[in-house]
């Protein structure tokens, strides 16, 4: 169970870094629809 949770957290961190990179370029557009990076990463995943 602990390994599964750790794997999920690693996956979230990985998608968060990807969404952060794309959020730097399209931050102005996404700020109106998805204000949080976490919400965007969940949406992208």
UniProtKB/Swiss-Prot annotation:
Residues 12-39 have a biased composition (Polar residues). Residues 1-45 are annotated as: Disordered. This is Putative uncharacterized protein DDB_G0276421. It comes from Dictyostelium discoideum.
